[in-house]
């Protein structure tokens, strides 16, 4: 697996969390949250992020239930991943994002209680969790 920069996405109908990470340290950092309207991403903003970071690949969280059933957002996340590949000609990898939002909320709670839990931050930290999981699994 080439060393370099990778972008992680936590797809949602209202917001898409974005994180940036690197293979060398298998770590990621929350980057931003991109607004979506009725599940339609802001492709201009996504293009700016991709142009700025020039990633080796894009990682998209795939929402599923604990018992492996697919959620209503699973097909939308798959569609988003396919659109990313088609628009930007980059490899796109899907990662089981089970409990990534719960983990992100827990992290924010540890940082300062309920006052620290902001939806936009949860999404970008969830993207960070997704990306770090992929980086560690693909070593």
Swiss-Prot record:
This is Putative pre-16S rRNA nuclease. Keywords: Cytoplasm, Hydrolase, Nuclease, Ribosome biogenesis. Its EC number is 3.1.-.-. Belongs to the YqgF nuclease family. One of its GO terms (biological process) is rRNA 5'-end processing. One of its GO terms (cellular component) is cytosol. The lineage of its organism: Bacteria, Pseudomonadati, Pseudomonadota, Gammaproteobacteria, Legionellales. It holds the Pfam family RuvX. Its main location: cytoplasm. PANTHER family: POLYNUCLEOTIDYL TRANSFERASE, RIBONUCLEASE H-LIKE SUPERFAMILY PROTEIN (PTHR33317:SF4).
């Amino acid at each position: 697996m080439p060393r370099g920069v990778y972008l992680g996405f936590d797809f949602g109908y209202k917001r898409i969390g974005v994180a940036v990470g690197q293979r060398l340290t298998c770590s990621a950092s929350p980057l931003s949250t991109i607004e979506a309207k009725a599940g339609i991403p802001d492709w201009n903003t996504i293009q700016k992020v991709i142009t700025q970071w020039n990633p080796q690949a894009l990682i998209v969280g795939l929402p599923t239930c604990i018992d492996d059933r697919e959620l209503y957002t699973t097909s939308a996340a798959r569609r988003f991943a396919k659109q990313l590949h088609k628009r930007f000609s980059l490899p796109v990898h899907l990662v089981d994002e089970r409990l990534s939002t719960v983990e992100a909320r827990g992290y924010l709670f540890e940082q300062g209680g309920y006052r620290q839990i902001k939806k936009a931050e949860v999404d970008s930290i969830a993207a960070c969790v997704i990306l770090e999981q992929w980086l560690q699994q693909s070593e």
